[in-house]
Amino acid sequence: MPRSWTDIVAEKRAIRDEKLTKCYGENVPSDPRIIAAKDIQALTKLLEARNVTAEAVVLAHIAKAKEAHQRTNCLTEICFDEALEHARELDAFQQEHGRLKGPLHGVPVSLKDQFNLKGLDSTLGYVGRAFHPAASDCVLVKVLKQLGAVILAKTNLPQCILWGETDNPLWGLTTHPMNPEYTPGGSSGGEGTLLALNGSMLGWGTDIGGSIRVPSHMNGLWGFKPSSGRFSYEAVAVSQDGQQQIPSVVGPMARTLSTITLASKAMIEAECWRLDPQLPPMPWRKDVFQEYLQKPLVIGIMVDDGTVKVHPPIERVFKEFCKKLEAAGHELVPWDTSLNADCIKIMDEHYIADGGEDIRRDMAAGGEPYMPHVQNLVDRGSAISVYEYWQLNKRKKATQAAYNTMWNATKSSSGKPVDVLLVPTMPHTAIPHRTLRYPGYTKLFNMLDYSALSFPAGTALKALDSVCTGEYEPRNAADAWNWSLYDIEKMDGYSVGLQIVGRRMEEEKVLGAAHQVQQLL
């Protein structure tokens, strides 16, 4: 007789919880310099000087990870024992060779549940995928280990992944570090909370509609969505596997831009295309990074996407930051939003092209109930024919071409082309669970396959953002819903993220420009 889905859930959680109850010396104070190290560079200096060991670094972060999980329910698969063993191997390597193994030597890393890690499940929040451990590491994990990184744990995500919050029947609800009644975002929400609470130094998530950038925005982090093909997706489990027209991408999340940049550069310089034939052999372009690290920028600005107006704190932070950019000598250009709605519509049609069959099959394998957002997704429409899919792809290509033409035609008052865009990450800050409905500000750039970095630009402040919202007349149902969520009394102090956006394969440009932007924060 098949086991009930509730029995499987109970067993999976019991295995995780048993690993979390094991003592790793939490009663012994760790070196305060470890957690105080703000980024990889600072940690590397401590390790190189032998002020701390990799083992001590991992132990300190295990303690923080356990605290973060107790507070937010962010972890799924635990590999603390393996992490400590790896850390001791790194210490032995340094003792023998007198140097660190690689640019990520001893860096505690966490992974969204999707990434295959040998011996552990990649469930995607599906009960039916429990107790089917990966036979080998995915390419990204193999390379991370070669670079010296230490994998601590895997983190929670929503059922079927495709949502901006983090909840599923298998692992349960992940909550915001500041308020258990609020969502940390998603779908890389477990990463967002773990990083925000110092349980990891570098996280890796995935993004098909904002899944790296939304939790980064809500948790005060930096989150980088590259174009498809810069980082390996080989052996990373995903819903709707085979749907490649709107590709999910892998990207880093961290508390600092320097960590994002170092991790991105190290991963690209590792030449993962030798292990993953889907990647183009595109090396790190130092000259491009250096150029945009220094040159005055021309920035297209879009505070309103034309569909859903952002809340007052988002608008205030955006406009204040624009003033800083102009004062620093950068040129700002208003951005045309006329193609945005078409981009979102085409993207949504790709999500449901199979009529929900892929998700239904995974759900049938476990027998658990559908989360409301998943039920809504699979009920949205019937599968389309191959010919209809071809026509949809043609519309996508035509719209991408039109957007590119628009970008090329947009110039500053001095006649210079636009380098990057500045855009809100979301129309609101963190909000109550199960109320997120509109990630259009992030989805736009998945449809275009652009490079986009979300960064913490400010916070909602009751003293500055207590404005009357009743005077605004919403444009549509999504806009009305968004405005119904605004409550500055409850949103006071929550992070506000903005995005720097470049075109396809412009990762070095975006990161270089971001370092200029960071100086103004």
Swiss-Prot record:
Induction: Expression is induced in response to 2-benzoxasolinone (BOA) exposure.
Active-site residue numbers: K112 (charge relay system), S187 (charge relay system), S211 (acyl-ester intermediate)
Residues given in the record as substrate binding sites: S187, I208, G209, G210, S211
UniProt catalytic activity: a monocarboxylic acid amide + H2O = a monocarboxylate + NH4(+)
InterPro entries: Amidase_CS, Amidase_dom, AS_sf
Keywords (A to Z) from UniProt: Hydrolase
Keyword Transcription regulation tagged: no
UniProt-recorded Gene Ontology molecular function terms: hydrolase activity
Signal peptide positions (record): none
Family from the record: Belongs to the amidase family.
Reported function: Amidase; part of the Fusarium detoxification of benzoxazolinone cluster 1 (FDB1) involved in the degradation of benzoxazolinones produced by the host plant. Maize, wheat, and rye produce the 2 benzoxazinone phytoanticipins 2,4-dihy-droxy-7-methoxy-1,4-benzoxazin-3-one (DIMBOA) and 2,4-dihydroxy-1,4-benzoxazin-3-one (DIBOA) that, due to their inherent instability once released, spontaneously degrade to the more stable corresponding benzoxazolinones, 6-methoxy-2-benzoxazolinone (MBOA) and 2-benzoxazolinone (BOA), respectively.
Annotated protein name in UniProt: Amidase 1
Organism: Gibberella moniliformis (strain M3125 / FGSC 7600)
